[in-house]
């Protein structure tokens, strides 16, 4: 494949913001001032905050996005789907990291809201306008944004809960338990959209299951703990639906699984 220099300003910008996003996440996870707060091992937690190991999904997302910023030089599909929205998403994501680390949690949530909007624009444009014609399209265009979209949605909800229903030293109130279970149920229910919309998105759905198992591991309150496990199992099982349909011969174009 020949290198495609069309839209090079956007492609160069994608590389720069990718490096910024990667550096910010690495710094928040492994470096920095111990007095600063990290979204991945945060002082600001709620009763739907998952275990810290779940945040290592960023490693896979960053690896795939790194492939995307290389792949963009060999096909115009990346620019057609992503445009300048990856730049916007990365800048708002970096702003979120900085604001959260400095304790500006509400402003951090606003920044994350705009980052989620930019990622969602890319995600739905890919679903509506572009079919994955090659394995490289799947791995370095569809898959990274499937994972990114599901994960940033989870982060948005968990950050909101950390602001409005934080952990209490005396344990959760009854309202907080019910509120947490409702939040988990809402997140789990979005698996229907991931599996049923367009061609189906197994990768995005599995991110939700991964998150719910992380909550199961982290939260000790019985109702929240076991609800997270039950919902995680249910979500993981629901992701098998497209494969079951294929196995029994009921597969249609609307339910064909697409990893990304």
What is the meaning of each model-derived region?
Residues 16-23, 85-97, 111-123, 141-159, ...:
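Alpha-helical transmembrane segments of multi-pass integral membrane proteins
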Residues 43-57, 138-145, 169-172:
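Short aromatic-rich membrane-water interface segments that cap or initiate transmembrane helices
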Residues 2-15, 58:
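N-terminal membrane topogenic signal
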Residues 18-35:
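Alpha-helical transmembrane segments of multi-pass membrane proteins
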Residues 97-110, 167-172, 193-198, 219-222:
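Membrane-interface helix caps and helix-loop-helix hairpins in membrane proteins
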């Amino acid at each position: 494949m020949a290198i495609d220099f069309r839209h090079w300003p956007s492609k160069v910008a994608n590389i720069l913001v990718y490096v910024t996003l990667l550096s910010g996440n690495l710094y928040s996870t492994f470096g920095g001032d111990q007095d600063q707060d990290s979204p991945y091992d945060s002082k600001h937690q709620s009763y739907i905050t998952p275990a810290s190991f779940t945040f290592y999904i960023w490693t896979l997302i960053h690896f795939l996005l790194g492939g995307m910023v290389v792949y963009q030089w060999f096909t115009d599909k990346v620019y057609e789907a992503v445009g300048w929205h990856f730049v916007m998403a990365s800048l708002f994501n970096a702003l979120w990291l900085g604001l959260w680390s400095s304790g500006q949690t509400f402003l951090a949530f606003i920044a994350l809201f705009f980052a989620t909007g930019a990622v969602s624009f890319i995600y739905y444009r890919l679903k509506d306008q572009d079919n994955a014609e090659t394995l490289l399209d799947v791995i370095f265009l569809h898959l990274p944004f499937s994972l990114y979209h599901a994960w940033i949605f989870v982060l948005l909800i968990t950050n909101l809960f950390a602001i409005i229903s934080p952990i209490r030293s005396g344990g959760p109130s009854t309202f907080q338990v019910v509120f947490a279970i409702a939040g988990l149920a809402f997140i789990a229910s979005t698996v229907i959209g991931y599996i049923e919309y367009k061609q189906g998105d197994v990768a995005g759905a599995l991110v939700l299951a991964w998150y719910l198992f992380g909550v199961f591991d982290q939260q000790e309150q019985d109702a929240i703990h076991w609800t997270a496990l039950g919902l995680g199992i249910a979500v993981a099982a629901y992701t098998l639906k497209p494969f079951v349909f294929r196995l029994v011969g009921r597969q249609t174009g609307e339910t064909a699984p697409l990893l990304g």
